[in-house]
């Protein structure tokens, strides 16, 4: 009998629903919220209200595109955390009510696990090459920077993580200082393609082990701009492409330095990247260069799977469904939770 899983994602400012049948993606609908751009960041209350408006039509559209009726669903998987509590509660509450009304199992999914397992989403007509266990996954986003040893679908170990800011957060804040707008990641990425990555040098942390730190880079960037603008008030406008390229190169160097160490220490050649920052062109190019130089088998997600989406929640739910790993209807959402 087929396993058809509805996945629901509402951890931040994207409302998403997806349907997976026997591991194959049938639909993935994402509704993004433009309302936050005017505020230079996500406003939790506005995000929660938008989720309430979007959740029903998004789920309806996901089922419609999949050609599946709600009565055919085997289970409902939802993001339990981490994320914004007000946003999470919308998805969690809907999933509970929907599953209960249909009399089908409920499956809680860790948002971070979903990003890692996005590499196992299969789609008809696409090349479906997946990493072999064990593999390393660099999970980088606005809220997380982690090196994860993935031993199985349900067995992961964090080898290193940021002790302060995440990589994506540092990029967004530096972009904001430059007056480039929100979200900063895609803007920096676009500008960096036109600039010289060696034009400027910024501070790199010396953190023991496999942990990361990006607060020093952020401070170095801010102080450097302040000094340069004393001599030239229009310095940012005149040099923004080189600034973006140098910032991006520094972040990528920091990320890849620790990932190389992890790959060498654990003798692993299967290496993946996941999370919002995995859409960055400089990071993707660095992965390809490392694959050629060190013989890595690399796995870079489709752009549609880098940002928050329900397809990754549905595939994680599918694996948990096969293990009959269901949750109780009284399970709470968690704004802060690790793997």
Curated annotation (Swiss-Prot):
One of its GO terms (biological process) is tRNA threonylcarbamoyladenosine modification. GO terms for cellular component: cytoplasm. Its EC number is 2.3.1.234. GO terms for molecular function: iron ion binding; N(6)-L-threonylcarbamoyladenine synthase activity. Binds 1 Fe(2+) ion per subunit. Keywords: Acyltransferase, Cytoplasm, Iron, Metal-binding, Transferase, tRNA processing. Substrate binds at residues 139-143, 172, 185, 189, 280. Gene3D superfamilies: 3.30.420.40. Its main location: cytoplasm. It is an enzyme of class 2 (transferase). Its cofactor is Fe(2+). Required for the formation of a threonylcarbamoyl group on adenosine at position 37 (t(6)A37) in tRNAs that read codons beginning with adenine. Is involved in the transfer of the threonylcarbamoyl moiety of threonylcarbamoyl-AMP (TC-AMP) to the N6 group of A37, together with TsaE and TsaB. TsaD likely plays a direct catalytic role in this reaction. Belongs to the KAE1 / TsaD family. This is tRNA N6-adenosine threonylcarbamoyltransferase. It comes from Bacteroides thetaiotaomicron (strain ATCC 29148 / DSM 2079 / JCM 5827 / CCUG 10774 / NCTC 10582 / VPI-5482 / E50).
